[in-house]
Amino acid sequence: MVPKLVAHRGWASRWPENTLEGLMAAVDAGAEYVEFDIQLSVDGMPIVLHDATLERTAGRAGCALDMRWDELKNIKVGETGRLGEVCPHARLPSLSLIRDWLATEPEINAFAEIKTESLSRFGVGRVLEACLQVLEPVLDRCVMTSFSDEVLLAARQQRETSIAWVLERYDEQSLIRATSLAPEYLFCNYRKLPGSLDMLPAGPWQWVLYEVSDAQLALDLAKKGAGFVESMAVGELLSDPLLDSGSETF
């Protein structure tokens, strides 16, 4: 069985993560599922960014949660230290920009992960409302995703939207909570799985395991019950003969 592939922050092995350019590159390579991260600026603008701070992707000091959108919109996040001159002028995108792109790609589904730093700073209600308002036109193709089960419960109560819970730990308590939450998708770092695990526990969810960059590993995880694997190297996996699209899929 061949799992479906999710582009983790876009085609992040080759392109700047969480940028329009990186997401477009993933889709151009054949990805049908993308994932991106959402933080909130101090003036309430949802932005697409993994870390709350700017050091890693922008190479400069500062916390995005303390800055206004007018300050953030021209910040370059081309990750030149990691990627060189692949896309040096890529700018930190607003969620609105990514939404507008998704609106032009009707076959693409997105996992929109709300980051816990913004939830802690601004509160579940404010962050969720800002995200849902922006994503409303494409919400039928977006899965609200988070480590926070609280924001996912609120999302489900406010909208008829699919949710994905990201496990901090793979243990009995987390699985009991997952059964109660009943998300459509359950994310987990595959390295957190017990080595003795033969089959992932079934539930109302589909399993999404990350961070996977090896085709044989993707197949092995699929045998354990993973319907999806998430990868920053999505383009490489899509072109790997082991994961040929002509093979049997979920």
Task: Describe these PLM feature segments.
Residues 1-250:
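Phosphate-group recognition and catalysis centered on beta-loop-alpha active-site segments
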